[in-house]
Design a protein with these regions (language model features):
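Generic structural motif
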Residues: 11-13, 68, 101
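Glycine-rich beta-strand-turn "strand-cap" elements at beta-sheet edges
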Residues: 39-57, 82-102
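Short, well-ordered beta-strand segments in beta-rich or mixed alpha/beta enzyme
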Residues: 2-9, 39-75
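Generic structural signal for secondary-structure transition and capping sites
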Residues: 27-30, 34, 70, 92-96
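Short amphipathic alpha-helical segments
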Residues: 14-40, 79-87
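Absolute protein N-terminus
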Residues: 1-2, 102
Length: 102
């Protein structure tokens, strides 16, 4: 199983717009062969000293895929190309970590 943690920082004030585009694209991703889960997450407010907040402009996408091949097909899909095209002008940065269990 492949896990992905994508940390996405929107331009100031643009996070909600990016999350709306994410939500519109999510059903197509969940329908892909090999997609186990695909979810956007934000900070839990006021959680305390244990938390390192992402911040008001940042969210993470937590993904699980059956295989590396399924993840590669996801990256090559037309709906992800469109999602990337529409969100790119709204983003300050993104960091993608592709992981496997040890």
């Amino acid at each position: 199983m492949i896990h992905v943690i994508a940390t996405i920082t929107a331009l100031p004030g643009s996070r909600d717009a990016v999350l709306e585009l994410f939500s519109k694209n999510r059903p197509a991703v969940l329908a892909e062969n090999g997609c186990i889960s695909y979810e956007a997450v934000i900070d839990v407010p006021d959680f305390g000293a244990i938390q390192t907040p992402l911040g008001t402009d940042t969210f993470a996408v937590i993904e699980r895929w059956e295989s590396a091949e399924a993840l590669k097909a996801h990256g090559a899909s037309t709906h992800m190309a469109e999602y990337g095209r529409t969100t790119k002008p709204l983003l300050a940065s993104r960091v993608i970590n592709v992981l496997e269990a040890c």
